[in-house]
Swiss-Prot record:
SUPFAM superfamilies: Class I glutamine amidotransferase-like (SSF52317), P-loop containing nucleoside triphosphate hydrolases (SSF52540). This is Cobyric acid synthase. It comes from the Bacteria. One of its GO terms (molecular function) is catalytic activity. Keywords: Cobalamin biosynthesis, Glutamine amidotransferase. Residues 255-454 form the GATase cobBQ-type domain. Catalyzes amidations at positions B, D, E, and G on adenosylcobyrinic A,C-diamide. NH(2) groups are provided by glutamine, and one molecule of ATP is hydrogenolyzed for each amidation. PANTHER family: COBYRIC ACID SYNTHASE, DETHIOBIOTIN SYNTHETASE. It comes from Synechococcus sp. (strain CC9311). The active site is at 336 (nucleophile), 446. The keyword Transferase does not apply. Pfam families: CbiA, GATase_3.
Length: 508
């Protein structure tokens, strides 16, 4: 165990803001000269990251690692559940897939292996960072009475590590007093002393308007309110794809309108964060059945269930709209599963990607790129970098990211119109503008838009078609902007939150 007590961020519910408060806490401790070690025993998310060793982990723990000044490693998130639909999730233990499980069987079959993986992750993380302080994030609510006996990542972990816990409540949702009092009242007597402070999140308005509420909470719970965080949702996108509709509104300076397909099994939507951060770009999320319109480009992001999402696109009429859009000169760009959907054929003999609606193992794609994908149980998990051959310019630009996919994609009939997107030919392809339709491109590289010069060159291609002046390609990697946002988050945290009761209290 570490010499300094572990800290833990619990929440009264899902979406209370635990992930960002944990990231803020990591950055603040780093500023104080500590080595914070972010850790979430079990996470459920299709927004993933691949570490340097090829291990899969939740993106939110990668973000917390960057906040701590560390390289992300899968030990920070030893159990990851990736929803596949039909109450089934893929299970990732210590970075690698160990199978799938239905919700009703998960705790029966996977509780003991999960707890073992969590302990192994803790040991690995502390061994590689001696002297570090664990900063834990809980999951959902810590007092789901029907799940408490099989809890893997909340109070079981807090008790195991004797962690000092802060309880976060989202006042924006309403009912913050009931959230807090109800949660505290459902804690068992042995658990209650672990809660060292309360944190009110997403408060709008003048701070003094909550003074009376703070006095009431402290008088009626005996737990100090560490502070009140203001509304900061404009800094980072939501962790959960269900919250995408709550993202930022229209930008006054937007000059490009880019449609992004809101797939039913959307994954790795953090790929779009660098575009969201561009002041001249407006992203518009389009779900199957909604109007595509005439955007300047369409991006099809990753999917956890590629064939099911492809069927949703085709059956809703969105597929036909995409094909007509491209025939009329529109630009379409696919990432990972999105690129696979752009091809001619997708084969899923093992039913890994949702299966075809008819029960066949092969399904026709959108037919916008001459590609054939065959899915297999082997999963590509690795960080990559390569020189981009497209878009063209005065010199090739380096792009980097990671692969995270099942399946092998090959080009059909040695197409003369379809060219490699970069020097590593298997990473992506591009079919240029022609008399037969607009440009279509795709890549397996998650994070491709994080490269500032490449992103700007891609945007400038769209701007040229609209008669807009080019943007400067002298743009840093998105990681620098992300780091600046983490600093802003930590600045607000230090301004509004008193950490001393959390850091200095005892568990006696």
């Amino acid at each position: 165990m570490t010499a300094k007590p572990a800290l833990m961020v619990l929440g009264t519910s899902s979406g209370a803001g635990k992930s960002l408060m944990t990231a803020a806490l990591c950055r603040v401790l780093r500023r104080r000269g500590e080595t914070p070690l972010p850790f979430k025993g079990q996470n459920m998310s299709n927004n993933a990251w691949v570490d340097q060793a090829g291990g899969e982990m939740a993106y939110s723990q990668a973000l917390q690692a960057w906040a701590a000044g560390l390289e992300p490693e899968c030990a920070m998130n030893p159990v990851l559940l990736k929803p596949q639909g039909d109450s089934t999730s893929e299970l990732i233990h210590l970075g690698h897939s160990v199978g799938s499980a239905r919700a009703e069987h998960y705790y029966r079959d996977w509780f003991k292996p999960g707890w073992k993986a969590i302990r192994q992750g803790l040991e690995a993380l502390q061994s590689s960072h001696p002297g570090g302080r664990l900063v834990l994030e809980g999951a959902g609510s810590p007092v789901e009475v029907n799940l408490q006996k099989r809890d893997l990542t909340n109070l079981r972990l807090a008790q195991y590590l004797r962690a000092h816990c802060v309880l976060v409540a989202d006042i924006e949702r309403g009912g913050v007093f009931a959230q807090i009092v109800g949660t505290l009242n459902l804690l068992r007597p042995v658990e209650r002393p672990l809660i060292k402070g309360l944190l009110i999140n997403r408060f709008r308005g003048r701070r003094e308007l909550f003074d009376e509420g703070q006095r009431w909470l402290e008088a009626n719970t005996g737990v100090p309110v560490l502070g009140v965080m203001p509304w900061l949702d404009e800094l980072f996108p939501p962790e959960d794809s269900l919250d995408l509709l709550e993202r930022r509104g229209r930008k006054r300076s937007a000059e490009l309108n880019i449609a992004v397909l809101k797939l039913p099994s959307l994954s790795n939507f953090s790929d779009l964060d660098p575009l969201e951060a561009e002041p001249t770009v407006q992203l518009r999320w389009v779900a199957p059945g909604e109007e595509l319109g005439l955007p300047d480009a369409v991006v099809i992001p990753g999917s956890k269930q590629t064939l099911r999402d492809l069927a949703a696109i085709l059956n809703s009429g969105l597929g036909a709209a995409l094909q007509a859009y491209n025939t009329g000169g529109g630009h379409v760009f696919g990432i990972c599963g999105g690129m696979q959907m752009l091809g001619d054929e997708l084969c899923d003999p093992e039913g890994l990607e949702g299966g075809a609606p008819s029960g066949n193992t092969s399904q026709a794609g959108l037919g916008l790129l001459p590609l054939r994908t065959v899915f297999s149980a082997d999963k590509a998990l690795r960080q990559r970098s390569s020189a981009a051959l497209w878009p063209g310019g005065s010199h090739a630009l380096e792009i980097e990211g990671f692969e995270l996919h099942h399946g092998l994609t090959t080009i059909n009939n040695a197409s003369e119109t379809c060219k490699p997107l970069c020097r590593d030919e298997e990473l992506g392809w591009v079919k240029p503008f022609s008399d037969h339709g607009g440009l279509v491109a795709g890549t397996y590289l998650h994070g491709v838009f994080e490269s500032g010069p490449w992103r700007r060159r891609w945007l400038n291609q769209l701007r040229e078609r609209k008669g807009l002046a080019p943007l400067s390609e002298q743009q840093p990697h998105h990681s620098r902007q992300r780091d600046a946002l983490l600093d802003r988050l930590a600045d607000a945290f230090e301004q509004h939150i008193n950490l001393e009761p959390l850091l200095n209290s005892s568990n006696g």
